[in-house]
Regions:
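Alpha-helical membrane-interface segments at transmembrane helix boundaries
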Residues: 12-23, 54-61, 73, 77, ...
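Loop-to-helix entry region at the N-terminal start of transmembrane alpha-helices
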Residues: 16-24, 71-99, 139, 183, ...
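Cytoplasmic-entry segments and transmembrane alpha-helices of multi-pass inner-membrane transporters
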Residues: 39-72, 92, 102-106
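Short cytoplasmic-facing helical segments at TM-TM junctions of multi-pass membrane proteins
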Residues: 103-142
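Transmembrane alpha-helices
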Residues: 127-159, 186, 191
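Hydrophobic alpha-helical transmembrane segments of polytopic membrane proteins
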Residues: 168-204
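Short cytosolic juxtamembrane segments of multi-pass membrane proteins
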Residues: 206-215
Length: 215
């Protein structure tokens, strides 16, 4: 009950932290989509790149999040931004790459060869086939990678509070330092709820964007 009272009494503060957390995750995952999807397309077209690119992305994901945030501090200190949003978003961006690149590669690489041949047969260029045939067919799997990245990094971004990124992780950090169980429980609940709601919303968006013929 104390936790519920705390959340009700601090609803505005919690809402502000939630929107900040959401914005940070959206920024990091958005950058990963902009870079990761084209990178997935590239390694499908140039297959010799697949092993080193996917291997590097996998290696990044094996680094503990607190260690990766720690690595960002001296790197970004060189440009005067050792703590704060920039190193946090960069670290979460790196974590987001693997599921997006891997799912894009898997989805496009597993398409029936006949689809590409049919596109060539009617005179479509590579980019036309990609835009009108391959990406729509691969969209459900690609979107699955995006959903994985978002849900995973809602939790990772909470840890970024230790380097001054803000967001819901502040509740956990302040709860630990102040031995305030209400803040700890409130932070954990808000992070879990945010992950569940975003996963559901992205699933609905995935259904809407997926062509009717392959739902």
């Amino acid at each position: 009950m104390d936790t519920i009272h705390y959340m009700l009494d601090n609803a505005g503060y919690l809402a502000g932290l939630t929107f900040q957390h959401l914005w940070l995750v959206a920024l990091a995952v958005g950058l990963a989509i902009i870079i990761g999807v084209p990178l997935g397309v590239l390694i499908v077209r140039h297959k010799w790149l697949a092993t080193p690119v996917l291997g590097f992305a996998t290696l990044l994901l094996t680094i503990p999040s607190i260690a990766l945030f720690g690595l960002m501090i001296p790197l970004f200190s060189l440009i005067g931004h050792g703590i704060g949003i920039l190193p946090a978003v960069t670290a979460v961006f790196l974590y987001s790459l693997l599921p997006i690149v891997r799912n894009t590669h898997t989805a496009l690489d597993s398409l029936p060869p006949g689809l590409r041949e049919a596109g060539r047969g009617i005179g479509m260029t590579f980019w036309q086939r990609l835009r009108w045939v391959e990406i729509p067919m691969a969209l459900p799997v690609i979107f699955g990678g995006i959903r994985t990245a978002v849900v995973m990094n809602i939790g990772v971004m909470a840890i970024a509070a230790v380097i001054g990124a803000g967001g819901l992780g502040l509740l956990l950090l302040n709860g630990i330092s102040g031995s305030d169980i209400r803040m700890l429980i409130a932070g954990a609940l808000m992070i879990c709820l945010l992950a569940i709601v975003l996963d559901w919303l992205l699933h609905r968006l995935q259904v809407v964007l997926t062509p009717k013929g392959i739902r």
